[in-house]
């Protein structure tokens, strides 16, 4: 049996990307952002097609993502942050709530969001992961933007066929 298959597309030319970066644990978040923006550029995304906004912490990321999504100006969004375990339950709360909010915004707005909010046990782990996770976020955003646009066209093709059939019936 032969099946149709979509190949991953990492071509970023013409894509509009919004980035929301937390300022809490700022050195790690800056490292994430630097790696992410560098990778977006490597993938062909123009600097003029990228908007980076910062928020105080990880819990504020979903609201900023929602505002960017509402604008309708982006093909994909990226969430960057670092939640590092402390001595209280707050780590779990921030990790779970920010992650759930990020996922909800993507689903509510039918918009890909690359979640690169690191959740680590300590600073050393966060620093060790920031560069590769920043790059990963850029690749995820570009790939998923291209995938969602390709999948959106599936419905357009069916609509065009139905329109042609309707026109033939009327003729």
From Swiss-Prot:
Active site positions: 90
Positions bound to 5-amino-6-(D-ribitylamino)uracil: 24, 58-60, 82-84, 115
Chain residue ranges for the region called Disordered: 150-171
EC numbers on record: 2.5.1.78
A molecular function (GO) term: 6,7-dimethyl-8-ribityllumazine synthase activity
Entries under SUPFAM superfamilies matching the protein: Lumazine synthase (SSF52121)
Record's keyword terms, sorted: Riboflavin biosynthesis, Transferase
Pathway the protein takes part in: Cofactor biosynthesis; riboflavin biosynthesis; riboflavin from 2-hydroxy-3-oxobutyl phosphate and 5-amino-6-(D-ribitylamino)uracil: step 1/2
One Gene Ontology biological process: riboflavin biosynthetic process
Main EC class the enzyme belongs to: transferase
Reaction(s) catalysed (UniProt annotation): (2S)-2-hydroxy-3-oxobutyl phosphate + 5-amino-6-(D-ribitylamino)uracil = 6,7-dimethyl-8-(1-D-ribityl)lumazine + phosphate + 2 H2O + H(+)
Comp. bias intervals (Acidic residues): 154-171
Gene Ontology, cellular component aspect: cytosol; riboflavin synthase complex
Pfam families the record matches: DMRL_synthase
Binding residues for (2S)-2-hydroxy-3-oxobutyl phosphate: 87-88, 129
Described function: Catalyzes the formation of 6,7-dimethyl-8-ribityllumazine by condensation of 5-amino-6-(D-ribitylamino)uracil with 3,4-dihydroxy-2-butanone 4-phosphate. This is the penultimate step in the biosynthesis of riboflavin.
Similarity annotation: Belongs to the DMRL synthase family.
Identification of the protein by name: 6,7-dimethyl-8-ribityllumazine synthase
Record gene name: ribH
